[in-house]
UniProtKB/Swiss-Prot annotation:
GO biological process, one term: glycogen biosynthetic process
Xref: PANTHER family: 1,4-ALPHA-GLUCAN-BRANCHING ENZYME (PTHR43651:SF3)
Family in the record: Belongs to the glycosyl hydrolase 13 family. GlgB subfamily.
Gene designation: glgB
Listed GO CC annotations: cytosol
InterPro entries the record matches: A-amylase/branching_C, Branching_enzy, GlgB, GlgB_N, GlgB_N_E_set_prok, Glyco_hydro_13_cat_dom, Glyco_hydro_13_N, Glyco_hydro_b
Species per Swiss-Prot/TrEMBL record: Burkholderia ambifaria (strain ATCC BAA-244 / DSM 16087 / CCUG 44356 / LMG 19182 / AMMD) (Burkholderia cepacia (strain AMMD))
One of the record's GO molecular function terms: 1,4-alpha-glucan branching enzyme activity
NCBIfam families linked to this entry: branching_enzym (TIGR01515), PRK05402.1 (NF003811), PRK12313.1 (NF008967)
This protein's name: 1,4-alpha-glucan branching enzyme GlgB
């Protein structure tokens, strides 16, 4: 009689993991005035239905030795299952006794591309349903035949927790009672062609196992959302759009995995609390205004430096629990330091547990390899023309801003997104609908991203940066004016030109003078950051110090002069870790910066110079207030190529002035006359050749006085001694 309670077709389909709708047969169902309860519990020896108080309601008979049970109840209210396993007894609510979980309106918003709906719907969320505690799982996989959640709680058996498909949105959902934060899980998917895929990590996981393990982890989202922040004052003081461009920005770029390691504990990476103890005081003491982390969302391959992430919502478990990052940001803000994270929407790795062929189809990526594979990195390219993919990525950026209070998002590899033929030969790319090379879907995505992060869904004051290496127009123009809407763009052209200049032997620099001046032709066409990033000190390019020609003294002197030029030049500043003390070695992701070099006075001198440049830059409005406006700069000497001398003035709205003079030869130049834009006493604000920085201490005894001798288009001038390979800053006393 009991075998009539469980249809053989359903049994076979469930045991084979092929049932299209497990809720149609599992759980409670009313049949001819009785309640029939069916359960799939492979390995169970005995199953009974009990009340929440433990009173027996009836036995569920075994109708198939593989673990199918069924029985009838006179009671149509809540019940629990008392399950006898070979070595234990378990009492749990039935996952298939709960109705639909996700709101249809929210699912419709997700399908329409609303990033807030991703945060509302997807991922693993500890919650309470009908008075029962558990975890709600939801994942987008519209082309799968079947999706199950698997984990430690069900022995990673895809038969035990098949999910409900919410048509037509392609989202699968299931509430698993009796589990909570800390559970490890993945999804098991059967593709449309019937084959079972490798277990997939949750694209929207808020936490993960530490690599090389690859499971997702149920995060305590309630605790994260209730985190005791102490940075209200910081957040409210973040400048609005019209003011943030006038602020000093000096950014210290950090690879968190290697900045400092813990040698006494198997040389592991420092966790977030340890980084907070060490990194925040260092950044503050060095005068940087912000720390920028290379990607910290979970990434399987350490050698990618984080630029091939697979858990866009989860801080990497390499650095400890996810709430540790919240504590780091909170402490950084308390110390007056902003936090920027690198973020990668251009591509993702093809690891079997990741997004590639997620439901057996090209779901997150393009199906055509001419669009869907990146030739430089052998990675998959996001299909940004798909609403759900765009919403998924923007939701990730939004989550970093909302959940972790980050101050800025730096978007990686923007140029590769904007051009369909990026790194592709003829015949290897697909034109857009107009026959052109511009990636219109990426343009729309980037505009939507910036509008979202600058809109009401995000906390006020979030700043966006573009790593964009071409001359694409309007990267920092508003979306309303047809631009991409970024706040700042990395000035890759300035970086390449100026580094190529200082790499030249001083005797040859006269022939390349325009490399230092050309950047001012376009310096105000966008709002720029001047980046000396990790990309310039790796892959055989040499560290900044090694790029400089000459002996060790000349190399460090040239680097000091270059830093003085850079910090006076229009544009916000960014410097990669190790460069602040002139490390000789290239960046290596599995080794720390060579901190031992600070035992040498020459390297301590460079470090002290960077500290003083930062402090002076931040304290002197003439050096930052009009970074993004042509009125804040004018040349004094831009054509003295024979002597490799440059001089220019910076000013703010009130007329405050700073003049920078650079001598990029090892020849001291006494009696060098330079026009100055104001009469009187000018003090030496900065001299990169000072002895405390490792220089010769040549200079002007701290001050100069003008004469009524016109020069360089100015009514007054002064005669200076220009130190060798050095930059001077002067300001009116």
């Amino acid at each position: 009689m009991t075998d009539m309670l469980f249809d053989r077709t359903d049994i076979d389909a469930l045991l084979a993991g092929r049932h299209p709708d497990p809720f149609a047969c599992l759980g409670p169902h009313t049949d001819a005035g009785r309640v029939v309860v069916r359960a799939l519990l492979p390995g169970a020896q005995r199953v009974r239905a009990v009340t929440p108080d433990g009173d027996e309601l009836g036995a569920l008979a075994c109708v198939d030795d593989a673990g199918c049970f069924a029985g009838t109840l006179a009671h149509d209210g809540r019940y629990r299952l008392a399950i006898d396993w070979p070595d234990t007894r378990q009492i749990t609510d039935d996952a298939y006794a709960f109705g639909t979980l996700l709101d249809e309106a929210a699912l419709a918003r997700f399908a329409a591309g609303d990033p807030a709906a991703v945060l509302d719907c997807l991922g693993a969320t500890p919650t309470r349903v009908d008075g029962v505690d558990g975890v709600r799982f939801a994942v987008w996989a519209p082309n799968a035949q079947r999706v199950s959640v698997v984990g430690d709680f069900n022995m990673w058996d895809g038969r035990r927790h098949p999910m409900r498909l919410r048509r037509p949105w392609g989202v699968w959902e299931l509430f698993v009672p009796g589990i909570g934060a800390g559970e490890h899980y993945k999804y098991e998917l059967r593709a449309a062609d019937g084959h079972v895929l490798p277990h997939k990590a949750d694209p929207c996981a808020r936490a993960t196992e530490a690599p090389p393990r690859t499971a997702s982890v149920v995060a305590d989202t309630a605790a994260l959302d209730a985190f005791a922040w102490h940075d209200d004052g910081w957040l409210h003081a973040r400048p609005p759009a019209d003011q943030r461009f006038r602020m000093p920005w000096s950014i210290y770029e950090v690879h968190a995995e290697s900045w400092q390691r813990v040698p006494e504990d198997m040389d592991r990476s420092a966790n977030w609390d340890e980084l907070a103890e060490r990194l925040i005081p260092y950044v503050r003491g060095m005068g940087f205004t912000h720390v920028e982390f290379m990607p910290i969302s979970e990434y399987p391959f350490g050698g990618s430096w984080g630029y091939q992430p697979l858990a866009q919502f989860a801080p990497s478990a390499r650095f400890g629990p996810v709430d540790g990052f919240a504590r780091f940001v909170d402490r950084a803000h308390a110390a007056g330091i902003g936090v920027i994270v690198d973020w990668v929407p251009a591509h993702f790795p093809n690891d079997a547990h990741g997004l590639a062929q997620f439901d057996g189809s090209a779901l997150y990526e393009h199906a055509d390899p001419r669009e869907g594979m990146h030739p430089d990195w052998n990675t998959c390219v996001f299909n940004l023309g798909r609403n759900e993919v765009s919403a998924f990525l923007i939701a990730s950026a939004l989550a970093w801003a909302r959940r972790y209070h980050v101050d800025g998002i730096r978007v990686d590899a923007v140029a590769s997104m904007l051009y369909r033929d990026y790194s592709r030969n003829e015949g290897e790319w697909v034109p857009n609908i107009h026959g052109g090379r511009e990636n219109l879907e990426s343009v729309a995505f980037l505009r939507a991203l910036n509008d979202t992060l600058h809109g009401t869904l995000a906390p006020p004051g979030v700043v966006t940066f573009a790593e964009e290496s071409t001359a694409w127009p309007g990267v920092t123009a508003s979306t309303g004016d047809g631009g991409l809407g970024f706040d700042f763009k990395w000035n890759m052209g300035w970086m390449h030109d100026t580094l190529s200049y200082v790499r030249e032997d001083p005797i040859h620099r006269r022939y390349h003078h325009d490399r230092m001046t050309f950047g001012l032709v376009y310096a105000f066409s966008e709002r720029f950051v001047l980046p000396l990033s990790h990309d310039e000190v790796v892959h055989g390019k040499g560290s900044l110090a090694v790029k400089m020609p000459g002996d060790a003294w000349q190399r460090l002197a040239t680097l000091r002069a270059y830093f003085g030029f850079m910090w006076a030049h229009p544009g916000k500043k960014l410097l990669f870790m190790g460069s602040e003390f002139a490390q000789w070695a290239e960046f290596a992701h599995d080794a720390t910066p060579h901190w031992d070099l600070l035992d040498a006075p020459a390297h301590r001198g460079v470090q002290r110079l960077v500290r003083d440049l930062n402090r002076t830059y931040a304290a002197e409005p003439a050096l930052h207030a009009l970074d993004c406006h042509a009125s804040g700069f004018f040349w004094l000497i831009g054509d003295d190529r024979d002597n490799s001398v440059f001089a220019f003035a910076r000013r703010d709205d009130s007329g405050r002035l700073v003049v920078a003079i650079c001598n990029f030869t090892p020849v001291p130049r006494p009696g060098y006359r330079i026009g100055l834009p104001a009469p009187g006493h000018w003090r030496e604000l900065m001299n990169t050749d000072a002895a405390v920085y490792g220089g010769t201490n040549a200079g002007n005894d701290g001050a100069v006085w003008t004469e009524d001798v016109p020069s360089h288009g100015q009514s007054w001038s002064a005669t200076l001694r220009l130190p060798p390979l050095a930059t001077l800053w002067l300001s009116p006393a």
